[in-house]
Amino acid sequence: MAIKDWHEDDRPREKLLKFGAAHLSDAEILAIFLRTGTQSQSAIDLARHLIEQFGSLAELLAAPQETVLACHGIGPAKYAQILASLEIGRRYLDSQLKTGQGLGRSQMVKDYISTHLRGEPREVFAVLCLDNALNLINFEILFTGGISSCSVCIKHVLRHALSHATSQLIIAHNHPHTDATPSTADNLLTYELKKACDLIDLSLIDHVIVGRNETLSYAENCLAPFG
């Protein structure tokens, strides 16, 4: 049965407007962006199939272009719609953080970093430079490594921070193929960078790790040296 023939309260767009986004499943949200399905599938059926195929909505959004385009029912137009939905979220978070409306909220910081780092096929290391009011001055990926490690130069991180006249910073990196549990090397880097920042009156306020399916904040979890 086509979605237009469903009861009004069950149609994704009408359901969204009447009850709010919290009442929609991932498949229903995705179906709104897909707009149409195929000859044999409704937009919701197609959305469910994609999420099942990739394992989660997050995995779908992080998948390489060629992998998504190889899926039945997904052409360039639908893929562009999926990318646009992700970019809308990124730009919203970016605007919030640049006006100081989000950096005091741990979840928004994690969401912002996650939208930028999840999907990177290799391990990368990024720095968020902030002013005293926690407005975002700059976000940049400074180092790119391999599939399971990334070399970081602490002196380069400090030079980068000073070049943006920042007083506070957050560091972040990803685990492309594992969960967000910090490794011994992650903990050592965090400690050494915190010590180096303290010497030049820079405040390192968090280290965020983006795993395959979750994001971890050192500060939120009171992990050393923030605990």
UniProtKB/Swiss-Prot annotation:
Keywords: Hydrolase, Metal-binding, Metalloprotease, Protease, Zinc. This is UPF0758 protein Psyc_1834. Gene3D superfamilies: 5' to 3' exonuclease, C-terminal subdomain, Cytidine Deaminase, domain 2. Belongs to the UPF0758 family. GO terms for biological process: proteolysis. GO terms for molecular function: metal ion binding; metallopeptidase activity. Zn(2+) binds at residues 173, 175, 186. InterPro entries: MPN, RadC_JAB, RuvA_2-like, UPF0758, UPF0758_N. Residues 102-224 form the MPN domain. PANTHER family: DNA REPAIR PROTEIN RADC, UPF0758 PROTEIN YEES-RELATED. CDD domains: MPN_DUF2466. SUPFAM superfamilies: JAB1/MPN domain (SSF102712), RuvA domain 2-like (SSF47781). A motif (JAMM motif) lies at residues 173-186.
